[in-house]
């Protein structure tokens, strides 16, 4: 069998305003900045690179492919897993995050809550729910 495709080493989100996104991700959510240049800011989240990239400066990465035009609605959906969705939700609310869905148990066995970053990317916090035997 050939090389395996079974790991994601980085997530890169295109953003409209790099400074606004840096303030949200570092200042509100809290991960440390690992690198920063005129086009992007990189954070380390549990061993994975998480990068916000100014969309109008993504020429090298897109190699001539057009970038999306501004539109309404979510463009990405990301999940962070936690052992206590209610505690993480309360902590993020204290830091100024506005949730559009409060923590609730879902039929797929998770307790989830949802918020958006400044560019409308949807984040889910998810906690596995212990099933009764």
Model-based region annotation:
Residues 1-9, 32-80, 87-116, 127-133:
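Vicinal oxygen chelate
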Residues 12:
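Polyanion-binding surface elements
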Residues 21-26, 92, 120:
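Conserved active-site tyrosine of GNAT-family acetyltransferases
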Residues 122-125:
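Short glycine-/small-residue motifs
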